[in-house]
Amino acid sequence: MAHAEEPEDRTASTEPVVRPGSLLVSSTDLVEPAFRRTVIYVIEHNDAGSLGVVINRPSETAVHDVLPQWAPLAARPSALYVGGPVKRDAALCLATLRTGAQADGVAGLRRVHGRVVMVDLDSDPEVIAPLVEGVRIFAGYSGWTYGQLDSELQRDDWIVISALASDVVAPARVDVWAQVLRRQPLPLALLATHPIDVERN
């Protein structure tokens, strides 16, 4: 039986607890180039630590150049995204399921949250294709040991927000950082107007 649309497929809000499917949105105080206006999608969060990928850092490398068999399924832009500083030589793939599609029992798919799934890049793209709207492939990931992310949250380095499935495959032309904040209630939504270059003001 097809699952109903999860609430996070229609709306997203701030939440105090990190879980798979959360977004970590960098605060305006994080002005270092590596972290400024970063949005991380959390894939795992447990007693062993946390793992996620940066969803708004496209690289100049085309998916076709590294994993040509997955290029037809890659969401635009069909570029490899920089998921984080850990294991940059390894690839990780997320996808959004088509409405009504099920990942349970499908070899190569593992549900993360809602319509977002992890894809085993060794699986057959032709099997995956009918089930997904698009895939996003990341080089590397962002990781925290147990308690490390909690410390960063206590410093207000990150704002925790529920993700929409569409956030994972947002086009490069979309300012995901601003878009995610803009759909939050006031006063948080006002942060979306924060200038990209603070030196201009």
Curated annotation (Swiss-Prot):
<dbReference type="InterPro" id="IPR003774">
    <property type="entry name" value="AlgH-like"/>
</dbReference>
<protein>
    <recommendedName>
        <fullName>UPF0301 protein RHA1_ro03630</fullName>
    </recommendedName>
</protein>
<comment type="similarity">
    <text>Belongs to the UPF0301 (AlgH) family.</text>
</comment>
<dbReference type="GO" id="GO:0005829">
    <property type="term" value="C:cytosol"/>
</dbReference>
<dbReference type="Pfam" id="PF02622">
    <property type="entry name" value="DUF179"/>
</dbReference>
